[in-house]
Swiss-Prot record:
Species classification: Eukaryota, Fungi, Dikarya, Ascomycota, Saccharomycotina
Principal location listed in the UniProt entry: nucleus
Role description: Required for correct translation termination and probably involved in regulation of hypoxic gene expression.
Compositionally biased intervals (Polar residues): 25-35
Name of the protein in its database record: Enhancer of translation termination 1
Membership in a protein family: Belongs to the ETT1 family.
Localization (cell): Nucleus
Chain spans, region Disordered: 1-35
Assigned keywords, A-Z: Nucleus, Transcription, Transcription regulation, Translation regulation
Organism: Clavispora lusitaniae (strain ATCC 42720)
GO biological process, one term: regulation of translation
GO cellular component term of the entry, any: nucleus
InterPro entries documented for this protein: Nro1/ETT1 (IPR024318)
Amino acid sequence: MAPKRPLGIGKAAKAKKQKKESTENESVGETAASNELTVELDEEIEANDAVAQLKALWKTYFASEDKSELMLNGIIHECDRILRKTHNTKEQDEDDEKIELSGRFYAIYALALSSLAFYHTEDLKKVNDFFAEAFDRIESGRKAFPDSVDLAFAEAKIMISRIPLVEVSQLLVDSRVGKERSDVSKSLDASLAKWEEAQKQAVAQNHFHHYNAENFDFLQALDDLLDMVDNFGQEIMEGEDSDAEEDEKPHVELDEGHPLFAIKSSDKYNLWWREQTIAFLDHLNKNIENASAKELPALAVLKRELCKRLGQSYLMEAEVPANVFTTLSYYSKDAKSLNGLTRVEAQKISQDLFKRALTYLKQAQDEQEPETWVNVAEAMISLGNTYEIDSKEQEETYKEAEAILVKANNATNGKYEDILENLMQG
């Protein structure tokens, strides 16, 4: 049974929205009044430590819900200034500013440059220029800091970010692999290999602090890309068939020679996503063990998000065998199998998957978010549906789900009344 992913949020749509809010940037790395940006520093950061302040500025940008091109330009401007100053001995002697370059410095520099591409998605030349400069910063950083884990993770992220903006954006349904269009799976495989390399470096050095929201962004980018490939061409088809039902998505078949065919026709990328998300969660737990009290809240939020996504992934995979079990149990009792599964096989597979989903969904619960409790209850109901009618297992599972729904319903003034009534009537 092929593993599934919850749908991505659509990086291209997000970039398009950001572009509308951005200011015009004339050339790579150029800025305007961007040095006015400031950020509140932690007490442990020295006021004259330029690189430490840059890290704080990047952290603020990454966590901001109102990201802008101006903020990125401010970061790049500061990177430019710091790098110039390291080559100017006279300027360094004129003040007491502390500058100590690191792999993290070059990683921030490169990530900021590549992020600018999302504000210029309609100008392929600019997009290519931003990525070229980003990779140049990675290369410079590698020469100075060859064992930097920060650079390895940053390079993987930049590689995967480039794919939708430079390669997928230029494709049509009738595109074919050739001199002008390459097989996109090759670029994707390279970015995944780079991520695995970064993981090995981090684990070998016991640097589990790298398992944070910023680096999880790579797995989110992969999720978005796979979602984009799954739905490739549908917007065009939907535009041609304006009378189609809203819930009916047109099915787009890609030719074997299409640059996206190898990705769309293979389950290995979904499997890789899940395996790497599970590994990320394991390493995140080690990060949490050694994190400071200040870092714990954000890491706890990230852990719940990972568990939620993994839980949803197993729920989606359970849909097919669960439907086979239901069909063979109640609607096609004379049939021996469906979709290659017997009733008993479908029952066992779906139960195993629902139980795995619950393992993660329970960890994704937030005492302040009743919806996360309901996610657990609904998964329990789905599991209960795969047990024999009126069996002890079914009754116990439904009872536990009911208790959770009652609690959530009371906490939300009846928001989940319909779900609760359906369970009790069933």
